[in-house]
Structures are given as C-alpha cells and as structure tokens.
Regions:
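N-proximal, solvent-exposed amphipathic alpha-helical segments enriched in charged/polar residues
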Residues: 47-70
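Short, small-residue-rich loop/turn micro-motifs
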Residues: 74, 81-85, 128-130, 204
Length: 212
C-alpha cells in the first residue's frame, strides 16, 4: 500500500516537473518563430527599398536625358505635375499641352520602370490633390476625376502605342486625395498653388502579389 502510494506521488511529481519544462520549450519555439518572422520582414523591406532606390535613379536619369520638365521627389521617386499645366480652374478635362507632355513622359517612364524592374513593380498610382479651398467632398470629387482623366488618357488609343502599355494598363489606378495632403511651407502655411497637383508614383513588392 505504501509502495503504491509512493509510486502515485512520484508520478505526480514527474507530471508537475514535465509541464513547466514543456511550457518553457513552447515559449522558446514561439520566440524563435517570432524572431525569424521579424528578420524575414526586415530583409524583405531592405530588398524592396534597394529596388526602389535603383528605380528612382533610373527615372531621374531618364527625365534628365530627355529634358522632360517635371518634378521628381529625390527620396521616393514620385513625379509631380502642377495643376496649371494639366487643368483649368475647377476643371478635370486635360489640357492639350498636358496630353503632349504625357505623350512624351509616359512611354519613357513605363520603359524605365518595367524594363529592369517590372517583376517587382506591383502598382502604378496616379493621385489627384487639391488645396483647402472649398469643401472636402467637393475637392475629393474633383481630385478623383482629375486622377481618372490622367489615367484614362495614359491607357487610351489617343496617346498611341508604346512599350509596356499593356502592363501599365494592368497596374495603374486612380486615387483622389482631396485636401488630405496639402503642401506646407516651413511656417506650416498651406501653399495652395503647389498643393493643386497630380502625382504619379509606383509601389514595389518583391513577392509580386497584387492587391485585390
């Protein structure tokens, strides 16, 4: 009877010793998995940034070589067109000079983006921006229509055929930002002329997974 009781106690002690050890093991495995995921995400981010830097340099070089008069953000490669060159006040109809500018710029831009980096470019975004005059909803509608007007021309027959046009048509989207991203001076005052603009930018994804 005593022997049986001792065996029972020993089994309970073994179980009580087992669970803390098992829990520690699970915690260790979980920590390793978390560290691996963090490391992998960091590596992916680094690779994507490297690709983006290469694209930025290529785009800047292309614009310089072809004397295309647009602004480019040195940090992220965003290309900016001022409102005055593209639209009349309160209008979303593209000016003829805007069409001529896009007819020169877009073929060069598409070739630069897709020739060496096409498999990693997941999206081309055309954004319309306004100043803070008027209601947010009015500006949202205007900025969206302006972005769509640019996209519609870029993929239209009117602009003509150019290399990678089909690929660009698959990837391009139009977004209206309203007055959400106005440009401000050092004192924090809104620069309305600069805020009214259209931007063309790209997104990089080395996994090449398109957003739904």
């Amino acid at each position: 009877m005593i022997s049986k009781y001792r065996r029972t106690i020993n089994k309970e002690e073994e179980l009580s010793n087992f669970w803390p050890t098992f829990t520690d093991l699970l915690a260790t495995v979980l920590m390793v998995v978390i560290m691996f995921l963090i490391s992998s995400e960091s590596m992916v981010g680094g690779v994507e940034q490297g690709i983006a830097n290469s694209i930025n340099e290529s785009v800047k070089q292309t614009l310089k070589e072809n004397c295309i008069p647009v602004e480019i953000d040195e940090a992220n490669g965003d290309v900016t067109f001022g409102e005055a060159a593209f639209f009349d006040t309160d209008s979303y109809e593209l000016k003829e000079e805007a069409k001529e500018m896009l007819k020169i710029f877009i073929p060069k831009y598409a070739e630069t983006i897709y020739k060496d980096y096409g498999e990693h470019v997941s999206k081309i975004v055309v954004e319309g921006h306004t100043d803070d005059v008027g209601t947010y909803i009015y500006n949202l509608d205007l900025s969206q229509k302006r972005a769509f007007s640019v996209v519609n021309y870029i993929v239209s027959e009117e602009i003509g055929e150019y290399k990678y046009k089909d690929k660009l048509t698959e990837d391009i989207i139009a977004i209206g930002r309203s007055e959400a991203e106005t440009i401000k001076d050092k004192e924090g005052n809104i620069e309305r002329d600069k805020s009214r603009r259209v931007e063309i930018k790209y997104e990089v994804n080395i996994n090449n997974e398109k957003d739904a």
